[in-house]
């Protein structure tokens, strides 16, 4: 969010991109894309590299199944539409990173008739569950489609109290069609035995010249000096009592709060001084203890 806001503030189009779940390992990840030279390129947010399209997640991204971003307004572009609201449109940008295939799921009832308006969940195996990364509705032809990376994806379809499942296979690099039959009742348990294969590791080209690497090292050194100059203003055990300027039975606890507050120490000191002036320092300290370390220093 910070990097996107900073780039937009100086006129560079930027957006957050994320994979809802990795297909090859647990968890997810988010990063930043910028619009340069007529195309979107990525960077690792607050992880500066010498060039665009270089980040620690280049190989993981090559194994992704889905990548999403939000576009303000009533967007109408070539990407898959994941979700549309009055304020934004969520789209699938996996094609910017890897070779994709189009998965077409047709939903039928137990008698073989197509089902319109059925929910179709495209699921990625992650953290021991089939996570519904995208849920779409079938159209008038009983179909829902989605572009993904070349990996296995579990499909769950449901409508009118019935459901069915299927598997999109990794060995099909071309468009993949799957028919899911709603042949189970919502109250009915189902046992399945499946193997889930993530996309194979690929390569997202990332190269930087020696000059670019050297220039980036100089920038990092300069940025480190700015950060260290700022952190040197934080309160520590040596100057805490002097900065606090209060002689009370709660001084030790108050000093600890100043140290934990890091760059926010002035605001926390002001709060404690006002509390002390009103004979409420003990209560004020108890309230500060309820805050997480992150909250007190933000």
Regions from the language model: what does each represent?
Residues 82-96, 170-208:
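Extracellular beta-sheet/turn segments enriched in Thr/Pro/Gly and aliphatic residues
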């Amino acid at each position: 969010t910070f990097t996107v806001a900073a780039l937009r503030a100086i006129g560079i189009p930027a957006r957050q991109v994320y994979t809802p779940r990795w297909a090859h390992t647990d968890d997810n990840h988010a990063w930043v894309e910028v619009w340069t030279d007529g195309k979107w390129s990525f960077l690792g947010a607050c992880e500066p590299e010498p060039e665009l399209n270089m980040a620690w997640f280049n190989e993981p991204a090559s194994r992704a199944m889905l990548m999403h971003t939000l576009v303000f307004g009533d967007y109408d572009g070539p990407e898959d539409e994941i979700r549309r609201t009055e304020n934004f449109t969520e789209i699938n940008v996996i094609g910017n990173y890897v070779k994709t295939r189009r998965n077409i799921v047709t939903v039928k009832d137990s008698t073989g008739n197509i089902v319109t308006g059925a929910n179709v969940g495209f699921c990625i195996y992650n953290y021991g569950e089939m996570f519904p990364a995208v849920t779409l509705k079938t159209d008038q032809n009983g179909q829902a489609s989605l572009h993904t990376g070349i990996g296995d994806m579990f499909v769950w379809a449901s409508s009118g109290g019935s459901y069915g499942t299927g598997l999109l296979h990794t060995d099909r690099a071309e468009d993949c069609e799957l028919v899911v039959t709603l042949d189970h009742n919502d109250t009915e348990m189902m046992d399945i035995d499946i193997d889930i294969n993530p996309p194979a590791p690929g390569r997202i080209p990332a190269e930087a010249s020696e000059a670019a690497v050297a220039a980036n090292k100089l920038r990092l050194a300069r940025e480190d000096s700015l950060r260290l100059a700022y952190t040197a203003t934080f309160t520590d055990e040596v100057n805490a009592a002097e900065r606090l300027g209060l002689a009370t039975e709660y001084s030790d606890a108050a000093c600890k709060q100043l140290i934990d507050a890091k760059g926010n120490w002035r605001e926390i000191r002001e709060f404690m001084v006002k509390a002390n002036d009103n004979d409420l320092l003990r209560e004020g300290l108890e309230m500060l203890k309820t805050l997480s370390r992150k909250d007190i220093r933000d």
